[in-house]
Structure formats: structure tokens, C-alpha cells
């Protein structure tokens, strides 16, 4: 993403900022399932786990990553649901995915919810006690989006009350030590890992080079974010 770029200042100085959407989407989607299999098999602690076949997976935000998650989920035989405030329901359903009316419905209906929303003023800390609390028994929350979308104190409170819930992420929370107390129900990679594959890095580098060349060749700003 471009969360670390001061978009407003760049615009003020007439600096063009672009991103390379979709270049790491498969890498992130594959990691979602790496985390998910780890969680449903009880973090390989020797105890019997569960299977993904027939489980309901909810995807919050149906962009490049969300669509790849849906593609992989179908291979596991999962029922896939999605909600995206900016993607029409008929577009979602045209890909063989059930579209729901709102994020509350997504959390209520699904066994597992995978987050793919950006960190915006509207989404920051929106994944909170009330929302996650709607999940079914033995629900699993996966975050490969941004840590800012999680209301950490409220999720900690909920996990303390509901010992059936699991939370896995590739973004180390600020309250990692507190989450770690939920042994067997929480896992975080040491650093952001979703896009860290050789293929994703190559794809992003090539895409960036092409965009820079296009900008200087004919002023193309197709992927401008400011």
C-alpha cells in the first residue's frame, strides 16, 4: 500500500504518486490460506482440528486480493460470501460468490472472515467488539489488510470472553503480548508478510518501471492515487 506516503503533501508539491494494484494479490491470498490452515489445525499442537470443506468464508472487500481469496477458497470446497461497499452485488455474484447486504451479515453468516479493507478514516478500528462478536462459535478472524482496522482493546476483550474465537494475522498488533496470552487461538507473523514472495516483488517492480516509463513518455497517470 501507500499508507506511509504523505499524499496531501505530495499533491501540494505537484508530485505524482502511483501504486501498482494487483501485483501482489495472489501472494497475499495464498498467505491467507497458509494462516487459515494453521488455525483450523490448531496450530499443529497435536490436537484434532477441522477441515475447510463446506465451511463458510466471508471476504470483507472484494478487490484484487479478495477475488483471489475466493478463487482459492473454491478449490477447498468452501462456501464463499463477500461484502464490498463499492462493488455491486451483481458483480460479486457473477464470480460465483454470495453477496451479502452489509458487513454485519457477513460476520453473522460466516465461520471465517478474511479482512481486505484499506485503512481509511471510515475503516480504522471498525473491526470491533460488536462486529466480531456476531461471529459463529469457533469463528476465525484473518487480517492481512492493515492493523489499523482492528480495534485491539475491544478484540482482546472479546477473545477473553469468548474462548472459542481465533485471530491470525500477518501484521503484528501493537498489543501483541496481550494477544499472545490467548495460547492456541492467536498467531502473528513477525512482520508484514503478505506480499513477500519473489514473484510479487518482481511483478511490482516491473509494473512500477512500466508506469514510470509511461509517465515520462506520454504523461500517463492511470494508477495515480493523489
Where are the predicted features?
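Oxidoreductase and adenylate-handling cofactor-binding alpha/beta cores
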Residues: 29-45, 74-78, 206-220
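Glycine-rich NAD(P)-binding loop of Rossmann-like domains
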Residues: 39-75
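NAD(P)-dependent dehydrogenase/reductase Rossmann-like domain
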Residues: 175-185, 193-226
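Rossmann-like adenosine-cofactor binding region
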Residues: 87-181
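Structural detector of well-ordered beta-strand residues that form the stable sheet scaffold
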Residues: 16-18, 81, 140-142, 166-168, ...
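Short, acidic/turn-prone active-site loops that include or flank metal/cofactor-
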Residues: 1-3, 22-25, 86, 106, ...
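Phosphate/diphosphate ligand-binding glycine-rich loop within oxidoreductases
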Residues: 1-50, 175
